[in-house]
C-alpha cells in the first residue's frame, strides 16, 4: 500500500513505483484523476500492471493510451456533470458561478458541467480555478462574488480548497447556496457546516440495481457504511481483480489484464457482492461468471 496523495501528480508515480517494485500483481487505485493518469501512464502501463480505480472520474481517462491495463468502476464525469446540471435546473437556479480544483478532475468536470447548464439556459457568470492547500480563500470568493450568481458550483474536495471556498463564502455572505461535485460529498462537510448547507445540493455516483441492494446488506453486516463516497466502487474494484486472477488461474499480470473484462461481463453466472466464494468456485471449475457490482 502507498499514498498517491490525490493532489501531487509528481509524487504519485514514485509511490506507485515502490509498490510495483514489491512485485504486486495489480493495483486497486488510484483515487483522484490527476494522479491516476500519472501513475497509469508513467508506471503501471509501462510495467504491464493492471490498475482499477474506484473513483477517478475525469473524462480524459477514457482516451488514455492504457494498452488494456487501466479500468475504473466509477462512471466518467462526462455523465456526472450532466446529472449535476440536471439537478441544478430542477432546483430552479438561473445563474451560477463555477470554481474548480486546478487538476484534471476539476477541469474536466467543470467543462462538462458548464456546457450542460448552459444547454439548460442557465447563465454561467464565471469559471475560475482554485488551488488546494491554502489557508484562506477570501480572494477567490471575492472574484466569484463580483461575477455574481444564484449559487456557486464547487468542484473540488471536501477536505481541501472546496471546503475553504464554502467557509469563505459563508464568512463573507457572498453565497449561501452551493452546488457540490462528488468530491465534495461527505459527512465531514455536514459536520463542519451543518444547517448552513440547507440550500445546497450535489450528486455522486450510485446505483439502484440489485447489486447495490445486496452490497448494502453485506456492508451493514460488516459494520461498514455503504452510502459513503465510492464505497461500493472500491469493493467492485477489488472483486474484479480477485475474480480475474481466478479466471486465468494465475496472479500473472498479463493474465489479470486479459480476464478483467471477461469476469465483468456476460455470458456467465451472475455474481453479486458477498458471493465472491461462489464466483471463485465456479471459475475454478472452468465456468464463466458475470460480476454484477455494487
Question: What positions do the PLM features span?
Answer:
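Extracytosolic ligand-binding ectodomains
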Residues: 1-294
Amino acid at each position: 500500500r502507498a499514498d498517491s496523495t490525490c493532489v501531487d501528480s509528481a509524487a504519485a508515480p514514485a509511490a506507485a513505483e515502490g509498490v510495483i517494485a514489491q512485485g504486486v500483481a495489480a493495483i486497486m487505485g488510484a483515487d483522484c484523476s490527476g494522479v491516476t493518469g500519472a501513475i497509469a501512464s508513467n508506471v503501471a502501463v509501462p510495467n504491464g500492471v493492471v490498475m482499477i480505480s474506484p473513483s477517478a472520474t475525469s473524462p480524459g481517462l477514457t482516451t488514455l493510451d492504457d494498452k488494456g491495463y487501466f479500468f475504473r468502476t466509477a462512471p466518467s464525469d462526462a455523465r456526472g456533470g450532466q446529472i449535476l446540471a440536471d439537478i441544478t435546473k430542477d432546483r430552479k437556479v438561473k445563474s451560477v458561478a463555477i470554481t474548480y480544483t486546478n487538476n484534471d478532475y476539476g477541469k474536466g468536470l467543470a467543462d462538462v458541467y458548464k456546457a450542460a447548464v448552459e444547454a439548460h439556459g442557465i447563465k454561467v457568470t464565471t469559471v475560475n480555478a482554485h488551488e488546494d492547500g491554502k489557508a484562506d480563500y477570501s480572494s477567490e470568493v471575492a472574484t466569484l462574488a463580483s461575477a455574481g450568481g444564484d449559487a456557486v458550483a464547487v468542484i473540488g474536495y471536501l477536505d481541501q480548497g472546496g471546503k475553504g471556498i464554502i467557509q469563505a463564502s459563508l464568512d463573507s455572505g457572498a453565497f449561501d447556496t452551493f452546488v457540490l461535485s462528488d468530491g465534495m460529498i461527505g459527512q465531514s462537510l455536514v459536520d463542519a457546516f451543518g444547517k448552513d448547507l440547507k440550500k445546497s445540493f450535489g450528486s455522486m455516483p450510485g446505483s439502484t440495481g440489485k447489486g447495490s441492494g445486496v452490497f448494502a446488506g453485506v456492508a451493514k453486516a460488516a459494520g461498514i457504511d455503504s452510502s459513503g463516497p465510492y464505497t461500493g466502487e472500491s469493493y467492485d474494484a477489488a472483486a474484479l481483480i480477485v475474480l480475474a486472477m481466478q479466471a486465468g488461474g494465475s496472479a500473472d499480470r498479463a493474465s489479470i489484464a486479459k480476464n478483467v473484462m471477461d469476469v465483468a461481463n456476460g455470458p456467465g453466472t451472475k455474481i453479486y457482492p458477498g458471493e465472491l466464494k461462489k464466483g471463485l468456485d465456479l471459475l475454478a471449475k472452468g465456468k464463466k461468471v458475470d460480476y454484477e457490482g455494487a
